[in-house]
A protein has these predicted regions:
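Membrane-interfacial helix-loop connectors
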Residues: 1, 7, 11-28, 157-248
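Hydrophobic core segments of alpha-helical transmembrane domains in multi-pass membrane transport
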Residues: 31-43, 69-81, 97-106, 149-157, ...
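Loop-to-transmembrane-helix entry motif
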Residues: 141, 221, 254-258
Length: 277
């Protein structure tokens, strides 16, 4: 329900298919229902009952960590506000936010380096070298993921330039209701990455005006439908690797809950469009 909450929603926002205010107004309730219903059902099931004991933290915590966390989150939220006030492209606001975070990180890191050097807690070879947090963060950028999305978007753009995407969109509108197509698109995002699906849909319906209900429904479907399979979202893939969650365990324990949440949220959106908006 936020223009920066999912990469596909950000694509629609940057493509001027949806606006911030209308996106929040139309999707916050369906998104809330999509979250609450499966969470409530899961709370009644035995595997999800009990207390969770967090493992003890290892290593010394940085006292400036909370400051950087809150600063980063605040500046991310600032991006839609910046676009609304200045009417500049969203990437300008994001780069401005990044530069502020990098500047503050460098200032804090330089001060901590100076203090520890004075106190004599560093070795001689370490005193002559200051590790930049900005350079350290840049070295962790996942270039394969960036190139993956670049390849996907270029492929869709090539198909769009040939007119194939537009032709397919016309055939879809003549064959099935567009709302049903959007629901199937959300389900398909659990198998196929949602980025190419949304990029293709933006080329299928070029005549739809900004803030048309279809664009908002696509934002909801693509953003939540991928959770039905663990491989359908970037967060699921990361969790599968970090927590060793198997594909079939997720499908058996979580997949049906995600399906219920997805369908109830979609139903809430369609009912709201029918009777309230």
């Amino acid at each position: 329900w936020s223009p920066i909450g999912d990469v596909t929603t950000t694509m629609l926002w940057m493509g001027e298919k949806v606006s911030t205010i209308e996106l929040i107004r139309l999707l916050i309730v369906p998104s809330f229902i999509c979250m609450v219903i499966p969470t409530f059902i899961a709370s009644l099931l035995k595997p999800f009952k009990g207390n969770f004991d967090a493992p003890p933290s290892e290593g010394e915590q940085n006292s400036k960590g909370p400051l950087m966390l809150y600063l980063g989150l605040s500046l991310i939220i600032f991006v839609p506000i910046f676009k609304t006030l200045t009417h500049l492209p969203p990437y300008v606001g994001m780069m401005l936010s990044l530069s502020i975070v990098a500047l503050v990180a460098e200032i804090i890191s330089s001060r901590q380096f100076s203090i520890t050097s004075v106190e004599g807690q560093l070795e001689k070879q370490e005193q002559s070298h200051h590790s930049s947090p900005t350079f350290g963060a840049l070295s962790k950028i996942e270039m394969p993921s960036i190139l993956f999305f670049l390849g996907i978007l270029m492929t869709v753009a090539a198909l769009e330039s040939l007119g194939l995407v537009f032709t397919f969109g016309n055939d879809v509108q003549k064959t099935i209701p567009i709302d049903l197509f959007v629901i199937l698109l959300g389900a398909g995002s659990a198998v196929i990455d949602n980025v190419p699906l949304v990029a293709a849909s933006m080329g299928m319906f070029p005549d739809l005006a900004m803030d048309n209900e279809t664009w908002h429904f696509i934002a909801y479907a693509a953003g939540t439908g991928g959770s039905m399979l663990i491989i359908g979202s970037a967060a699921g893939v990361v969790a599968m690797g970090m927590e060793k969650i198997s594909f079939f365990w997720y499908l058996k324990k979580i997949g049906w809950l995600a399906l219920i949440g997805y369908l109830t949220g979609a139903g809430a959106f369609l009912l709201a469009q029918q009777y309230f908006f």
